Amino acid sequence: MDTLKILKKRAWAVVIALLAALLFSQVAGVVQSSLSAVQTSRLILLDAGHGGSDPGAAGLDSMTVEKDLNLAIALKLQHYLQQAGYLVQMTRTQDEGLYGPDDANKKRADMAERKRLMEESGADLFVSIHQNSFPDPRYWGPQVFYRKGNEDGQQLADCVQKQLNAFTAPNNTREIKANDSYYILLNAPMPAAILVECGFITNSMESESLRSEAYQKKVAWGIYCGIEE
C-alpha cells in the first residue's frame, strides 16, 4: 500500500513537472514573439559609402580603397542586425555606384539616389559606413558623426562610439561630433542618422587591421551593440 502511494506521488510529480514545462515554453514563446515583433517593426537603412567609379579615400598602398572596406563592414553589420530580427535595407550590396550609365555627373547622381532611398525607405535608423583619412599618418581611431541638432542621432552616435571603442580601440580618445555639412546626414529624414568613420585608412597599422576580416567583424559588432544599446 505504501509503495502504491509512493508511485502515485511520483506520477503526480511528473505530471506537474510536465505541465510546468509546457506552460513555461508557451510563455517564453509569447515573450520571444513579442520581442521579435518589436525588433522587426524597426527598419534600418545601411549605407556603404562610395562604390563603383568612386573609390573614396585611398590607403598608403594602392590596393586599399575605402569603398571595399565600407561594403565589407556594412554586409557584416547587416548580418548581425538581421540575426537579431531587424529589417535591414542596403543602399548597395556590391561594388557599384548608384548612378546610371548616361549620368554625366556620376557623383551627383549617386548622392541623389542615396537621398531618394533615404526618403522612400521609411527607416527608423540610418547608418552610413565610411573610412577616415588624413595627410598625417599618425592619426587613428573610429569616430561617429551625427547631424547637428538631431538629439536622437546624438544619442545613437554616443552609444555606437562607446561600443566601437570597447571592441576595437579602448585607448581611442575621439568623441562623437556634430556635423552640419555632410550631405548624407543633412538629407536623412529618419529620427536618428549617423555616419561612422571606422578608422583611418591612412594609418598603416589601422589600415592593416581594417583589411582583416576578423577586425571588420569587430567593427560591425561594435556598431551593432551600439544600436542595440
Q: What role is predicted for each listed range?
A:
Residues M1-E229:
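Catalytic-site microenvironment of enzymes
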